[in-house]
Amino acid sequence: MKIIIFRVLTFFFVIFSVNVVAKEFTLDFSTAKTYVDSLNVIRSAIGTPLQTISSGGTSLLMIDSGTGDNLFAVDVRGIDPEEGRFNNLRLIVERNNLYVTGFVNRTNNVFYRFADFSHVTFPGTTAVTLSGDSSYTTLQRVAGISRTGMQINRHSLTTSYLDLMSHSGTSLTQSVARAMLRFVTVTAEALRFRQIQRGFRTTLDDLSGRSYVMTAEDVDLTLNWGRLSSVLPDYHGQDSVRVGRISFGSINAILGSVALILNCHHHASRVARMASDEFPSMCPADGRVRGITHNKILWDSSTLGAILMRRTISS
């Protein structure tokens, strides 16, 4: 009997240990290669390749519906690769939608979580709820900057790291908002979009201090992640894909821009905490919304509807 109990306890200990390891990742900013490799490890761990959108060993991935804890940690490394400093920042991310819920200062294990994630806890940390939410609307207002034109390089990430490590209290300050805008862009948004990954990664090997500048096109991608996620699974070789102002003319164009999409037909991906204009990257509220093929083009339904309406009015 004791042997049976021991084996059962050992089984659950192993399962628990695997789950703990599985929800901790490292994002290494030491070089462009280590950065991209780190992103790919996370994508592969949480996503499944779509065989219909694959070329030359590269695939579009869809987030698995998953089981167990919906959170994972991303430990930031390599911001100062020569000195090996600045390794105490951890971001806590929701698995099913890649929302960054807050950050952990690992020197004291305090978890500073955004107000809209006040229900979120993470093992081994003490939670402090910030006074502002995680929406881009709030972060840009408090930071006093727009994402369009925002510049990010190794120096600005170092400054952002130090701002987060020196923070205490519940106030969402300007420096924290700016820091989180930068880190969310080069973590969560880079996980979602190869276009953002590609734009930023080259700065890591550039000794001149050149910055990645977030373009209007980059921002447009981030604001349409939910719509893209709903439409792209229906791509089967159509001539092109249209979602709002976004247009892809081939599989390679899709893969060059998008890396990881939501599972829009799994209920957990469609749960919104705030108004849709605050979280425009969510899946459409109606999980049944799919892409529409018209004249050999795969359309987002609202984009096609708007165009057909304009044609009707003009005629």
Curated annotation (Swiss-Prot):
Reported effect, A253D: 225-fold decrease in cytotoxicity, probably due to reduced translocation across the ER membrane
Cystine crosslinks: C264-C283
BP-aspect Gene Ontology terms: negative regulation of translation
Effect of A253D: No effect on enzymatic activity; slight decrease in cytotoxicity
Active site, UniProt feature: E189
Region (A2), start-end ranges: 274-315
Known partners and oligomeric status: Shiga toxin contains a single subunit A and five copies of subunit B.
Function: The A subunit is responsible for inhibiting protein synthesis through the catalytic inactivation of 60S ribosomal subunits. After endocytosis, the A subunit is cleaved by furin in two fragments, A1 and A2: A1 is the catalytically active fragment, and A2 is essential for holotoxin assembly with the B subunits.
Family (UniProt): Belongs to the ribosome-inactivating protein family.
Name of this protein: Shiga toxin subunit A
Native organism: Shigella dysenteriae
